[in-house]
Amino acid sequence: MDKTYQPHAIETSWYQTWESENYFAPQGVGDSYTIMIPPPNVTGSLHMGHGFNNAIMDALIRFRRMQGRNTLWQPGTDHAGIATQMLVERRLEAQGISRHELGREKFLDKIWEWKAESGGNISRQIRRLGSSVDWSRERFTMDDGLSDAVKEAFVRLHEDGLIYRGKRLVNWDTKLHTAISDLEVENHDEKGHLWNLRYPLADGAKTAEGLDYLIVATTRPETMLGDAAVAVNPQDERYKALIGKFVELPLVGRRIPIIADDYCDPEFGTGCVKITPAHDFNDYEVGKRHNLPLLNIFDKNANVLAAAQVFNLDGTLNESVDGSLPAAYAGLDRFEARKQIVAAFDAAGLLVSVDDHALKVPKGDRSGTIIEPWLTDQWYVSTKPLAEPAIAAVEDGRIAFVPKQYENMYFSWMRDIQDWCISRQLWWGHRIPAWYDESGKVYVGRDEAEVRAKNNLGPEIALQQDNDVLDTWFSSGLWTFSTLGWPEKTKALETFHSTDVLVTGFDIIFFWVARMIMLTMHLVKNEDGTPQVPFKTVYVHGLVRDGQGQKMSKSKGNVLDPLDIVDGIDLETLVEKRTSGLMQPQLAKKIEKQTRQEFADGIASYGTDALRFTFCSLASTGRDIKFDMGRVEGYRNFCNKIWNAARYVLDKGEDCGQNGEAVELSLADRWIISQLQRTEAEVTRQLDQFRFDLAAQALYEFIWNQYCDWYLELSKPVLWDETAPVERQRGTRRTLVRVLEVALRLAHPFMPFITEEIWQRLAPLAGAQGKTIMLQPWPVANEARIDQAAEDDIEWLKGLMLAVRNIRGEMNIGPGKPLQLFLKNVSAEDQRRLSENDYLLKKLAKLESMTVLTEGAEAPLSATALVGDMEVLVPMAGLIDKGAELARLDKEIQRLQGEVQRVGGKLSNAAFVDKAPPEVIAKERAKLTEAEQALGKLAEQHARIASL
């Protein structure tokens, strides 16, 4: 083995070997265990969330594969409708070409060309992270098979009365000209205004105070052109007498009713609210309760129409309400209309006041434009009938959420579920399988030929397919079964569905998880007709945030690419990466400064195993993950530790009883074997419970502290002792080899590359059969090999050695200087342990002699420590220069007192505490605590030496 651990030298070649040998494919034996990769957008590259997700899924798959399960981890990518269309449009615009000039077919050809060029980027990154996915089964949501499944699902849901077309309010992106989902809307906190407007009462009505008008408060005065009512709270005494009366809508002259609704907060403004059902989601709900007309005043660009389109709640035209609008505003965009309408109110003496107001402004996450609630014809899934069985599946335990608290989030959304708008006004995506004749009648079918045959439509009847495509989440919702061949009854579908685990972030429980459950349970049935669930467990993790707990985003300049941590990146390239393509270029300087401060030397190459182990160690239940580069560095050191331990074992491990020769186990051998059983049980238990953090912690503790720090040291005296029986030396060599081999198998799901590399060299000595660690059996604890007596004896020995080590440290005695040791208050058990381990103790603690003092015997002037009730004494005569040591301690105490004074002064300075970021203050407080503790220890040490 190379002297130092070089991840790059081993990672790529091992992945190629595993893939070419087909080790990732299901082995065809054992109970099935399936995970479907949540498909990343084909447009993108993997971010830290994907890296985290992949580390967790691969740990599960490798763990279950080693347990003998027939594992399938299926990869794939999502066509990502809006994101992909925008990206390709921008590329074409840079060449001076618009998609409308190209036309639909040629534009789609361009997208497929682009997908062929760049679609492999994600696959390359997944490979680099060591993910053991079955590449032969890779899927894309626009593959032919998946497109057929999408059409089949749409047609079946339509036949079952669960898909319909209707005119409803949607999130409308005025730049992209499409409806978008709630997930694609970002609410931005902005400073805005609240306009208080005077609406005259009609028919001579008066308020309780004798006024002939109401004052309504609004953040969107331009929408008043579409007002259908003014609402007041039914309990508001000020307006009770006016309920059922009318106001005259200023500028428009339309009479609109005053209605009572609990939606109105009597404490907000004057307690009167204008209701515009066609341009506000809350108002739409009020409109439904009071059967108000819907007056659509905007076109698809959010420009004011010449006359409002007036509809009933069922989407039919309302011809009884006058939709006339003032000609002055026709064609104006909504913000220009706002200015002119406010000016007109002011000129008419109807503008009461304008107040500053904090707003939540909805913007499209792709276009950045302000989203307009807009009335339009769309396709919908009727979700309430689908939600009931999906709720029951979680209630009765067929699907479990881990952590369990996310079940409540799921239930609260599912019990208040709204119908799902599934159509998008895009070109890229699954085109809706619906056709219209010239009269506008709609026909749904798998293709045009089926539509014509089913409805007896001859060739003389022209049919036009719906131009819209389906919401990306619709095809993603079929992901677990469409990728296994549904609607055909394939062997893969029979074997691997339902899947076992979905690993996902909490932010898409509603948008993806819930919809997968609803669609799967309706469309996929067992032989007896009972519904199948898409997965048995949903493992929900938090967001991966930066070290300060901030969300990672391009605009914050704190995004990390997992592959930059794996392969390393120089500072200039990192700065360029973080500052290019910003939506807000003015942030570039700030981001550059921050990056140069945080990564002055760029990012070192840590390798995949260190990054994966970091992700697993941070995977505590449900909390957001604060990603810490210090942890990656620590786990890179862990890889080095394992590598160096393996070099020692391979060097010493020959003649370890691999041919059946007799062995004798030492106390240390029995102890480490016993500890191994406990670790096997603990790691397995925690992985079964999805506690990757605790499994990683148990593994780290065993390998670093018990095996490397203690057992390797305890093995040396046995191997050095020329008088030791050959069987005992062979027993220690065998234990060194076999315990490491088992530890490598335990670590493999977390750190696949380093474990494979070392295992290949160690396997012959350990008597392990097989070509790869991946397919080795998972270690199972053997309770018969737990040796409590050996554990107790070693803990006692460790206590004694640490006591001697501490005395050396406190008294500044060199580690190699032989010491005399005196022991007082020695029990019979202590005496036995001393006698049995005399050679071991003298070698490891560097002792010249050990003397047990009889009761009442005078001890020389010594530094002391306790091991249980036994007193450990190291005589100081001739070991230290008392004066020089006290002078050294005085100097160090003085330095620390200065540090305490400096940091304490900083923290008691109000100007510093008020202005400094919380993480800087926390750092200073930690410094102060550390300095105070060190000062206390030095003072104790000073007193001990002074008393000698």
Swiss-Prot record:
Keywords: Aminoacyl-tRNA synthetase, ATP-binding, Coiled coil, Cytoplasm, Ligase, Nucleotide-binding, Protein biosynthesis. A motif ('HIGH' region) lies at residues 40-50. GO terms for cellular component: cytosol. Gene3D superfamilies: HUPs, Isoleucyl-tRNA Synthetase, Domain 1, Valyl-tRNA synthetase, C-terminal domain, Valyl/Leucyl/Isoleucyl-tRNA synthetase, editing domain. One of its GO terms (molecular function) is valine-tRNA ligase activity. Its main location: cytoplasm. SUPFAM superfamilies: Anticodon-binding domain of a subclass of class I aminoacyl-tRNA synthetases, Nucleotidylyl transferase, tRNA-binding arm, ValRS/IleRS/LeuRS editing domain. One of its GO terms (biological process) is valyl-tRNA aminoacylation. The keyword Ligase applies. It is found in: Cytoplasm. Its EC number is 6.1.1.9. It comes from the Bacteria. It catalyses: tRNA(Val) + L-valine + ATP = L-valyl-tRNA(Val) + AMP + diphosphate. The keyword Coiled coil applies. ATP binds at residue 554. PANTHER family: VALINE--TRNA LIGASE, CHLOROPLASTIC_MITOCHONDRIAL 2, VALYL-TRNA SYNTHETASES. Belongs to the class-I aminoacyl-tRNA synthetase family. ValS type 1 subfamily. ValRS has two distinct active sites: one for aminoacylation and one for editing. The misactivated threonine is translocated from the active site to the editing site. Catalyzes the attachment of valine to tRNA(Val). As ValRS can inadvertently accommodate and process structurally similar amino acids such as threonine, to avoid such errors, it has a 'posttransfer' editing activity that hydrolyzes mischarged Thr-tRNA(Val) in a tRNA-dependent manner. Monomer. This is Valine--tRNA ligase.
